[in-house]
């Protein structure tokens, strides 16, 4: 059996996601509530403010959701482990989704003129995700 050359990318990608979730849990939600009035309407995602209030009131929900997200990704990685094509597709979708949220965090910080508490992982992601994407798309 030939080894799947893209399997090694799951761990750093999931590591960045996990680190981002930890960073987000520390104080991002309170920051979002404080600055939501400065975020342009086209950047406001539906139900994020509601989720922010829920997370402040019940942090265990956010912890559960974060663990659930990472468990789902690990399950998908497990299912795709024998197929390089499936791994490339799943990793590509995961990287696109992760990129969307990291760029969204950067944009809302830019438009509020405030440093949100998740910028460290966002900037790391902006550096690493193009490298990982290149490794996924090259043959």
What kind of region is each of these model predictions?
Residues 3-29:
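N-terminal signal-anchor transmembrane alpha helix
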Residues 17-22, 96-106:
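Aromatic-anchored segments of alpha-helical transmembrane domains
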Residues 34-52:
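Perimembrane loop-to-helix junctions flanking transmembrane segments
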Residues 78-82, 103-112:
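Juxtamembrane "helix-exit" motif on the non-cytosolic side of transmembrane helices
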Residues 106-139:
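Alpha-helical transmembrane segments of multi-pass integral membrane proteins
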């Amino acid at each position: 059996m030939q080894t799947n050359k893209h399997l090694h990318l799951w761990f750093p990608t999931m590591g960045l996601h996990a680190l981002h979730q930890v960073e987000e849990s520390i104080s991002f939600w309170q920051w979002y509530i404080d600055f939501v009035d400065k975020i342009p309407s086209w950047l406001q995602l539906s139900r994020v403010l509601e989720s922010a209030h829920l997370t402040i009131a019940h942090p265990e929900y956010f912890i559960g959701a974060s663990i659930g997200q990472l468990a789902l990704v690990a399950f998908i990685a497990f299912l795709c482990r024998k197929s390089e094509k499936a791994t490339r597709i799943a990793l590509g979708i995961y990287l696109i989704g992760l990129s969307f949220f990291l760029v969204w965090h950067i944009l809302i910080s830019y438009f509020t003129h405030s440093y949100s508490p998740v910028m460290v992982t966002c900037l790391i992601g902006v550096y690493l995700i193009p490298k990982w994407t290149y490794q996924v798309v090259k043959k």
